[in-house]
């Protein structure tokens, strides 16, 4: 929603936003079940107005080849990729390519558990070890990219949302 709003305000005019991994499916759930969203979003979706989850700025990463193309791009891009703890998933490929470059930034939007690569990065690790399938093992990767943490984002429900959901369940 934040990125879609920035785009609609002209702040991300020519910056593509790629969704890689289960993020695409999770975003689709918001459109499929708008009754769990706030009134403003729900009404936009029900009235076929500007559904922020289906904005033209979002591009699905369809293949490993497409991911490699994105990793090799020279122009700015935003990539939302799983896994949140930086212990697997598509984010590892982006990290391998972009960590050494100081003109890249990784933004953490969630909690990083103890012992995870994500936590080590947040704590300022200047080198991490990642699996390299070409070399068949772990290789050191220098971390020169910028690292930021943006609190307040979560893919999980808060207590109020969980309680509201529980009230709707009807046992069989």
Task: Give residue ranges: language-model regions.
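Acidic/His-rich, metal-assisted hydrolase cores and their charged scaffolds
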Residues: 1-172
């Amino acid at each position: 929603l934040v990125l879609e709003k920035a785009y609609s305000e002209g702040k991300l005019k020519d910056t593509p936003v790629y969704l890689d991994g289960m993020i695409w499916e999770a975003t689709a759930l918001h459109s499929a079940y708008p009754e769990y969203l706030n009134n403003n979003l729900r009404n936009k979706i029900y009235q076929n107005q500007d559904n922020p989850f289906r904005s033209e700025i979002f591009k699905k990463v369809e293949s490993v080849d497409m991911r490699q193309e994105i990793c090799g791009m020279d122009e700015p891009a935003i990539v939302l990729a799983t896994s949140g703890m930086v212990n697997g998933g598509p984010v590892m490929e982006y990290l391998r390519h972009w960590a050494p470059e100081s003109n890249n930034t990784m933004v953490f939007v969630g909690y990083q558990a103890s012992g995870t690569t994500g936590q080590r990065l947040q704590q300022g690790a200047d080198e991490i070890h990642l699996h390299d399938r070409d070399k068949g093992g772990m290789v050191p990767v220098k971390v020169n990219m910028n690292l930021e943490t943006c609190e307040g984002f979560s893919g999980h429900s808060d207590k109020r949302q969980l309680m509201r959901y529980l009230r709707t369940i009807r046992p069989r």
